[in-house]
């Protein structure tokens, strides 16, 4: 079940998975799992570097075809909260491949798009199932980012199911 609701400047999506909380945690914190599901339909993630600890950095490359041709987008950030199997919070900024933060407008983002946003993932153990609440603060609820997250979480559910762990 996916529900999207949000304040004006945040995307909030709640999703339940038929999988243990530690598996869902690994989907967010292990690069090989993250690469398998992150991004909208048609996107691939060739690079995912994660130093999952408070103050640790992350660098992710998202590639996709667009009407204007192939696009490669890099995102960098820092982990602010890491509570294993419970809560993960990190910042996210558009960057170059070296993790240098770029102006969002340089990457075609709309005027007023913040240079840094925050992603929070909260997990609740439901006895073999997991409830996840994703909050991406700093982007409007009706932005393309909301649709991108919805697609990514559908891919996440399929990847979790493919693991065959219940």
Where are these regions (language model features)?
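Short Pro/Gly-enriched beta-strand edge/turn motifs at strand-loop
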Residues: 31, 58-62, 100-108
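Intrinsic-disorder/low-complexity, polar/charged segments enriched in Ser/Thr/Lys/Arg/Asp/Glu/Gln
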Residues: 8-14, 21, 57, 74, ...
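Short beta-edge strand/loop motif at the mouth of beta-sheet-based domains
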Residues: 12, 32-74, 78, 166
